[in-house]
Amino acid sequence: MLLVIDVGNTNITLGVFDEDKIVGTYRITTTIPRTSDEFGLLFCDLLHVKGIERTSIDSVIIASVVPAIMYSLTSAIIKYLGITPLIVGAGTKTGIKVLTANAKEVGADRIVDLVAAYEEYGGPVFVIDFGTATTYDLVTEDGKFTAGITSPGIRISANALWNDTAKLPEIEILKPDSILAKDTVSSMQAGLVYGNIGATEYIIKKVKEESKLGSLKVVATGGLGKIIADATDMIDIYDPNLTLKGLRYIYQKNR
């Protein structure tokens, strides 16, 4: 079985594949620092909960945007699973040609998402990942990554509201029934959710106009992506496991 690990700024997401089938997914907080033993024991416990023996894992691939965590994480995989993981980085075969101004600055998570979207749904495709930051990336019909957009994620905006104001409370991020809010909590929810829906729809519209790709498919992923995807008909597909699928595709290209 293949263990795939996506290290994000907020969460670490793990998936286990048996051939092309996901048999387990897990999400833990990206806590720094953690020792290799903490990671190792945590991973073994998570696998055990789903009835997956650690000895059944024969391959591991990691994509990370948090360099500080990689030594402990890699050491844990080697020590507890007996496997040297494949780490997505420069020189990794992806099948996507990066044509942005500085390819080395593109986060591994973005490339992984693009690989999955292109392999699963074909191009041209516009991928939106509602993570810590919200990223929007464009891949052409022939697999070229030509443009990307980055904005503050929904949770970053929410944290700014309750951390940088004296009286606004911490709230659950949900779409209220109406944008015409009548209390503090629903007014914050309306601003966060409807504001992001509006921004997303405008960006999609402008990208379609400027790229002149009328047949562009729009694919969304990320923890809060379903809230936005369910509220607009401009997103064609919501795939919560897009990044995990991308890691599997990349592993297959590099085995």
Swiss-Prot record:
Top-level lineage group: Bacteria
Residue numbers binding ATP: 6-13, 132
Protein localization: Cytoplasm
Annotated active site: 109
Main location: cytoplasm
EC number: 2.7.1.33
Biological processes per GO annotation: coenzyme A biosynthetic process
Residues in coiled coil: none
Family annotation (Pfam families): Pan_kinase (PF03309)
Pathway membership, UniProt: Cofactor biosynthesis; coenzyme A biosynthesis; CoA from (R)-pantothenate: step 1/5
NCBIfam families for the chain: baf (TIGR00671), PRK13318.1-6 (NF009848), PRK13321.1 (NF009855)
Role this protein plays: Catalyzes the phosphorylation of pantothenate (Pan), the first step in CoA biosynthesis.
Subunit-level organization: Homodimer.
PANTHER family: TYPE III PANTOTHENATE KINASE (PTHR34265:SF1)
Protein name per UniProt: Type III pantothenate kinase
Name of the gene this protein is made from: coaX
